[in-house]
Design a protein with these regions (language model features):
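Hydrophobic alpha-helical hairpins/lids featuring a short glycine-rich hinge
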Residues: 81, 96-102, 111-127
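Short coil/turn connectors at secondary-structure junctions
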Residues: 28-31, 52-54, 66-71, 104-108, ...
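Single conserved hydrophobic/aromatic residue that forms the stacking wall/gate
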Residues: 145-157
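Short beta-strand segments
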Residues: 35-36, 73-75, 111-113
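Glycine-rich and small/hydrophobic secondary-structure elements
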Residues: 121-144
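Alpha-helical support elements that line or immediately flank enzyme active sites
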Residues: 73-102
Length: 157
């Protein structure tokens, strides 16, 4: 008999996760997620080969290059792509906000964004969403099940 995994990203022991509505997506759907483990996890990643990449790609490449991480924080509704230095600063700040809330170093936080291109992240909404997600981290992971399939795949891939 095949057992269906209803736990999602927290199926592995030691992982917690939460998805929240921060008001970034116009639809009002869940748009910020945090996945966290207290134990530093081995990480690997594949990234776009395009000459133009979103700011979170550059930040996350730096984290993945270290080989370990504690968390992933991602948002939907704003891709933080084609946003120049402000986008890079925002991606680093996104990692720092999550790190501060989780009690880890910012270079242990992978970041991801998906959504509208050419728009800066609404950092006030994102910061509130990250704090809300961290406050609601759970080992059941059920809050992430309700995130749209493409976003969920982006968050865990």
């Amino acid at each position: 008999m095949i057992k269906k995994d209803t736990q999602g990203v927290t199926f592995a022991k030691g992982f917690t996760a939460a998805g929240v509505k921060a008001g970034i997506k116009k639809s009002g759907n869940l748009d910020v997620a945090v996945i966290y483990t207290k134990t530093q996890a081995v990480v690997a990643g594949t990234f776009t080969q395009n000459k133009v990449a979103a700011a979170p790609v550059y930040v996350s490449k730096e984290v993945v290059a270290t080989g370990t991480a504690h968390a992933i924080v991602a948002n939907a509704g704003c891709a933080n792509a084609c946003t120049g230095q402000q986008g890079l600063d925002d991606a680093h700040k996104m990692a720092q906000i999550a790190a501060d809330e989780l009690g880890v170093n910012a270079d242990d936080v992978i970041v991801g964004s998906t959504g509208v291109i050419g728009v800066n992240l609404p950092m006030d909404k994102l910061e509130a969403g990250i704090k809300d997600a961290v406050a609601n981290l759970s080992a059941d992971g059920l809050s992430l099940i309700h995130i749209s399939e493409p976003t969920r795949l982006a968050l865990i891939s």
